[in-house]
Amino acid sequence: MAKVDVKLPEEFLLKLSRLGNKTDEICEKALEAGGEVVLAKVKENLSAVIGSGTRYESRSTGELEQSLGLSPVKQDRDGNHNIKIGFSEPRSDGSSNAKIANIIEYGKHGQPAKPFLKPAKSSSRKACVSAMQQTLEEEVSKL
């Protein structure tokens, strides 16, 4: 029976220990980078659908677009880090931004659906993943 000792270079071991200490911080930066990519696409899609294809002149105040944003990165009880794109509440008139966004996304009786969230999610997936990978590589290379 043979015995093998593998000794890793000190520099590599130091990087691994630093990475272990800053994992949460690095993951948050990567999630924020990916979230910004998707947020930009959602804003672009929302601007395109508001007021388009209506019988009457749009009454849009721009409040829905302004309330769109990213949540801070939070960790759930399973240890997963999450970031969300959504609307801040409440509106100045007391109604819900989420309700208005839902009506635009899925439509209602007499108003056709104008999806802006689902197309943004599917079309920005690759760009989001690449932005997250790039940020992760940059942060790891700084160690």
Residue ranges of predicted features:
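Short, Lys/Arg-rich flexible segments
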Residues: M1-K84, S92, A98-L143
